[in-house]
Amino acid sequence: MAMADQRNDKPGRPAAQRERRGWLSRIAPGVRNFAKRETPENLWVKCPETGEMIYRPDLEAALWVTPSGHHMRIGASQRLAVTFDDGQFEKIDCPQVVEDPHKFPDDRAYPDRLKAARKQTGEQDSIAAAYGHIRGQPAVVMVQDFAFMGGSLGMGAGEAFIAAAKEAVKRQVPLVIFTASGGARMQEGTLSLMQMARTTLALNEVKDAGLPYVVVLTDPTTGGVLASYAMLGDVHLAEPNATIGFSGRRVIEQTIRETLPPGFQKSEFLVERGMIDQVVRRADLPEVLGSVLKTLMMGRERLSPAA
């Protein structure tokens, strides 16, 4: 009987254990799910310059400038929000263009690359344009997004540039661009190279209207973009340590078979040699831009009666 009682006791213990396990199993998934919701995967960002891990909200509050002073690349929407007063602006609609006119052969179809870039950036092409106020001064601002296929210049970006230039002339306000590009978009061939000439002609209309055109060079500004509208401004500003040049450093060194000086093609190097006017920290850009634009527009108002 004693042995029988012991056998009868055994089923009771697993039942209690099952009850305890059931209680834990009910709360454990909730705790795990709560932890997942409260801890984003990209909570920490590594500084490209020093390797320091930076708390993402702190980096966003610092306008994506690391404690070491490194200016990280930011998207078009972020740039527009930071530049315009109170982050308020009106987006400028851009005409649609034919996609993949050359049926460019690649390991990944060009339309698929465009689709992925649009999903990543939320922009239609590498240039976004908007109208708003910078320290009270009305202006049309364009931003090149390097995350959109390296900020490459294609037909869509060219149309966006022209639409922005026309809007500036229509509203009689200054035109500003933040450049960031690797150059012309190879998938569009000669149609991409045509945009260098088309954007230059659009700028002629802005200048014929007596309106200022200010360029802010950000990292990196290279290739056909530098050879066209990036160097046609009335005033050229640049962010710190931005790479600015037509060809890459290694390409130049291999071509001329010489070692280039330290800091070559960096904004600080270029301002010392008179190629750009001023290097400005990102946090100070709205104030500096507002001051420059107001000064240039005051000069235009003084000249307009004589004209």
UniProtKB/Swiss-Prot annotation:
Q: How does it assemble?
A: Acetyl-CoA carboxylase is a heterohexamer composed of biotin carboxyl carrier protein (AccB), biotin carboxylase (AccC) and two subunits each of ACCase subunit alpha (AccA) and ACCase subunit beta (AccD).
Q: Which gene encodes it?
A: accD
Region annotation Disordered: residue ranges?
A: 1-21
Q: Which reaction does it catalyse?
A: N(6)-carboxybiotinyl-L-lysyl-[protein] + acetyl-CoA = N(6)-biotinyl-L-lysyl-[protein] + malonyl-CoA
Q: What is its EC number?
A: 2.1.3.15
What is the predominant subcellular site recorded for this chain?
cytoplasm
Return the PANTHER family for the record: ACETYL-COENZYME A CARBOXYLASE CARBOXYL TRANSFERASE SUBUNIT BETA, CHLOROPLASTIC
| Single GO molecular function | acetyl-CoA carboxylase activity
Question: Could you say which enzyme class this protein belongs to?
Answer: transferase
Key words of the record: ATP-binding, Cytoplasm, Fatty acid biosynthesis, Fatty acid metabolism, Lipid biosynthesis, Lipid metabolism, Nucleotide-binding, Transferase
Name its GO BP terms in alphabetical order.
fatty acid biosynthetic process; malonyl-CoA biosynthetic process
The name on file for this protein is Acetyl-coenzyme A carboxylase carboxyl transferase subunit beta
